[in-house]
Amino acid sequence: GAFTRTTKTSKRAISQKAIRQLAQLKLETYNQQFARDLFLFSYYTRGMSFVDIACLEKSNIRNGYLIYKRRKTGQELRIAWRQSMQDIVDRYPSLDGKHLLGILDNHAEKSLRQQRHYRQCLINKTLKKLSKLIDIDITLTMYVARHSWATNAKEKNVPVSVISDSMGHNSEKTTQIYLKSINADQIDQTNDILIDAITK
C-alpha cells in the first residue's frame, strides 16, 4: 500500500549544506568527479533522472532553455539553462557529437541501454563511497538528488503543486510521497511557531 512506499522513501534527501559539502570536495579520481558532478547536474536541473540526463542531446538546449521529455511520463519540461549546468557539460564533452554529456556513445559496440545501465551502476557505486566523505547518514544515489531537490524546495515554502510541475510528476500524490521525508523536527518547529503566536 501507499504507506510502505512512503516509509521506503523516508530517508532519501540531503540538506543544502550537505550538497554544498559534496560540491566542494576535492576529489582524486575522474570517476569520483564525474559521479559528483552528475549528482549536482541532476540537482541543478530540478532532480532530473539519470536516464533523462544520459539521453540528453545537444539539440535539447534551445534559446537559453533545456527542453526535454521525461522518458518515464513523456511530459515535456523546460528548465532555464544556467552557467552551473554549462560548466558540468564543458567538463564531460560528448563522446559522439550528439549527446549533451559524455555518458553514452552512439558509436560504441554496446547498446545505449547497456551503456546506460553500466554507467548508472558505476556512478551509484561511486556515490556510495562519496557518502562517507560528507556529513550525512544515508547513502548517496542519483535518486537522492531528485528527492533532495523536492525536499529543499518545500523547505523554501515552494507550494507542492509547483514542485510537482517542476519535477514532471503526473500527480501531486507522487510529490507528496517524495516529501514524506521532511522530518518530524520541522513539523514540531512549525507547530512551536503557531503555538507561540497564541501563547507569547
For each predicted feature, which ranges?
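Catalytic-site neighborhood detector that most strongly recognizes the C-terminal catalytic loop/helix
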Residues: R5, R70-G74, M167-D192
